[in-house]
């Protein structure tokens, strides 16, 4: 007789989590594609700083000259823990599920399987939204505020490639400004300091409107100047709109309309906020070095009460409590988005 496998065994829950459809996220999937998991709660991050040193001339009688190694800086971070959980009660298993037929013959055990899959899907989507928010905060502020129950700190990457246009006549809302010249200047700054060519520009909604409607931009986008730039708005998934391309720079321009629910700044008045500040833009390179790191998760085995440390992106766990009877489903993750070269992108506030 075959042994029965509980749906709440870690290996079974792990397979459920792995089979769930992913949530598409623009920043995370476009830039922070490299993933690495660790067996420790702390991770070491190497930050490299290159140079444009030229090979030295030497006399044929002297021979070679030693060139110093390019240095790097290692910092240790503790990836923040995110651990949303759901509760299943007896009522959840005995009553009809949303969308279930009034005359359904499903058993409580069958409903338990469906609810577990739905719960893990919801929990993983919440974690992925958190990862996307962390990526956006890293890009636009160079820091990740860690605010939650029992935690209030900031992970700061010492980002300095940013500029706010404060002079009224130079703001993109003024006809006297020159958005194309500004973008060229910021693009060159990243080339000089970050050693990469920015190929994507992500604009907030207000910046995108000011850019597209600016007379100098529209003049440049005249049909006769097709080789310089083109505007061809096109809707893409998950709030991303392709605006056009500045061919001269090889720079694709996007508007990213995506929001998240901020229910921790003021818990009494949760607010939907944009991932991309409406008055900001970022110039980025898909060839720059970004990573998603995941610290280890430590759980307690319900069978014997011993601690166990698990390496993985998303670690499921479950336990029960009595009076009233409840089962808890938890999905834990310790993500950290890492920009290995903080000079490889530029952020501006042009309006």
Where are these regions (language model features)?
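N-terminal alpha-helical "arm" segments
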Residues: 1-44, 338-351
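Short alpha-helical segments and helix-capping/turn motifs at coil-helix boundaries
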Residues: 28-31, 184-188, 313-315
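Assembly/oligomerization interface modules of large self-assembling protein complexes
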Residues: 34-102
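A short, structural micro-pattern
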Residues: 37-39, 195, 323
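Long, contiguous amphipathic alpha-helices that act as assembly "spine/axial" helices in icosahedral shell
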Residues: 84-158, 178, 182, 188-209, ...
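Structured, charged N-terminal subsegments at the starts of enzyme catalytic cores
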Residues: 151-171
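Acidic/histidine-enriched, beta-strand-rich ligand/metal-binding domains
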Residues: 171-201, 206, 212-214, 218-221, ...
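Sequence/fold signature of self-assembling virion shell proteins
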Residues: 218-351
